[in-house]
């Protein structure tokens, strides 16, 4: 039924969905996948969820990928600061013992990975 609406109306209605609901809706049919993957929709969701400014351009891989990367980075940062705030020695020990692998994302959403030891030994 919603597929029979004009694409602009459907896209406007979908702006009220959150991240997980939008992802679930995109798996219901091919027309919903096309509508739910609209770049304008993901741009609006990005600015609704995050108040950070971008560099003013369009992300290389689109707003959906940029949203997913930003959400993942925010989740990891929240977990990190939660562990530090808890001042729990076991949680901090686990963090430091398992933190040798690093993932970084630049502004365009490009992923860089590597191990913490990226400089020559002295």
From Swiss-Prot:
Residues 1-45 form the F-box domain. It comes from the Eukaryota. Pfam families: F-box-like. SUPFAM superfamilies: F-box domain (SSF81383). This is Probable F-box protein At4g23960. It comes from Arabidopsis thaliana. The lineage of its organism: Eukaryota, Viridiplantae, Streptophyta, Embryophyta, Tracheophyta.
């Amino acid at each position: 039924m919603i597929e029979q609406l004009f694409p602009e109306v459907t896209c406007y209605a979908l702006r009220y969905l959150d991240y997980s609901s939008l992802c679930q809706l995109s798996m219901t049919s091919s027309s919903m996948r096309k509508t739910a993957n609209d770049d304008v929709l993901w741009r609006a969701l990005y600015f609704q969820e995050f108040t950070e400014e971008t560099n003013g351009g369009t992300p290389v891989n689109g707003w959906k990928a940029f949203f997913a990367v930003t959400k993942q980075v925010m989740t990891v940062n929240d977990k990190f600061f939660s562990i530090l705030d808890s001042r729990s020695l076991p949680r901090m020990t686990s963090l430091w013992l398992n933190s040798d692998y690093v993932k970084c994302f630049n502004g365009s959403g490009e992923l860089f990975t590597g191990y913490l030891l990226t400089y020559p030994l002295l």
